[in-house]
Amino acid sequence: MSAVVPPVSRADRDPRAGHPPAADRHRSTVAVRAGIDRDSAFGAVTPPLVLSSNFSFAGFDRKRTYDYTRSGNPTRDLLAEALAELEGGCGGVVTATGMAAISLVLHALLQPGDRLVVPHDGYGGSWRLFNALAAKGAFELDTVDLTDPDALAGALARRPAVVWIETPSNPLLRITDLHAVIDATHAAGAIAVVDNTFLSPALQQPITFGADVVVHSTTKYINGHSDVVGGAVVARRPELHERLGWWANCLGITGAPFDSFMTLRGLRTLDARLRVHQENTLAITGLLDGHPVVRALHYPGLPDHPGHTIAARQQSGFGAMLSVEIDGGERAVRAFLDGLRCFTLAESLGGVESLVAHPATMTHAAMSPDARAAAGIGDGLLRLSVGIEHVSDLLDDLSDALQRAALAGSRVPGIPR
């Protein structure tokens, strides 16, 4: 790679330019066939795992395709290639974690004095990094409600370099209109970055709406088995891809070959897993919606969700994440969580197993109480990542949890809620 950092050209911000998604194969086929039957040395059907940290030169000043695994690795490149094709981008960079992917984008696209616009209700880990770097003077930071056109217009009037979009948002599942926000971002001369972790390219492809960069925590649905951490960044244009690749190598945050191999294996079942994930989620919303102990249910697949129409237009499915606000105070929340059999209390999401998290004390604990309140993340909010267990078992587990919460949340004389 060149020792000179490639510049970000204005052409990178042209929403009309892009790399179309694979037209000759369905995305599910692209995911299954990633790297299949491409081993010319031995004819291995699945791609071999290349663990070597370095690669020999053919002779003096005769570098082969690869020289050092931090800079490039055949196994990791197969994953990057597959993700780029699934997203409709020109190329991808695989990183060690999802947070490394976010860090990569910030390093590659921003410099001191630039302004970054981020959603007020996004992932707590992203929020922590944005604020930590802004406090060190890495860039100026604006936190706004991207679903509010007036708030967005005000932020864009301050001429940001990058607008960060997260849709659906984590954990409240708010929907941002990709077409409208990306068009407005480009009109302001800024680069549009979309975190697509909650849906994966199986259900949403932001580049088709003009996004310049798409970010993933591949730990989640792309791998789907809660046994690997990783991240990825996909670029719409070659100039951005080159810049991201340069910075990934420079920072040393590229993904490990074994992790890439495992993620490739998980990717092959992405479409099949998501079908069951979503079927189970739909059944669970039927149980939760209107239940006396449920103060609010956040799921874009519900017709009365504020973002339902937009989600139906820009997504090919509503996903398997939902959040629910439990009535009855901390006692009710504790009772709901205590005794769960099929939902494990844990951070992360997107695995085959069902998980439940309490954002205020877990995924979004880094946010100040005021920031959580502004985002609508209350102490009674629970986030569910619905797995692929038998739906009857999941429904029974949640039904019992709701009953416990209802009993615990009942007012008892002399005992505060």
Predicted features along the sequence, with ranges:
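N-terminal "arm"/small-domain region of PLP-dependent enzymes with the aminotransferase-like
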Residues: S2-N73, L79-A82
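Conserved PLP-enzyme active-site core in the AAT-like
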Residues: V4-P6, G18-P21, V93-H291, P413-P416
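Conserved C-terminal alpha-helix-loop-beta "cap" of PLP-dependent enzymes
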Residues: A296-L382, V386, S399, R417
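Active-site beta-loop-alpha junctions enriched in small/polar residues
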Residues: P168, T197-L199, L302, D327, ...
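Short amphipathic alpha-helical segments
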Residues: R64, C90, V229, T263, ...
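PLP-dependent enzyme catalytic core of the Aspartate aminotransferase-like
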Residues: M1-D14, N131-A132, E140, G154, ...
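Conserved N-terminal alpha-helix of the aminotransferase class I/II PLP-enzyme fold
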Residues: N54-S103, G125-A132
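Short loop segments at secondary-structure junctions
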Residues: N54-S56, A235-L240, L267, I326-R331
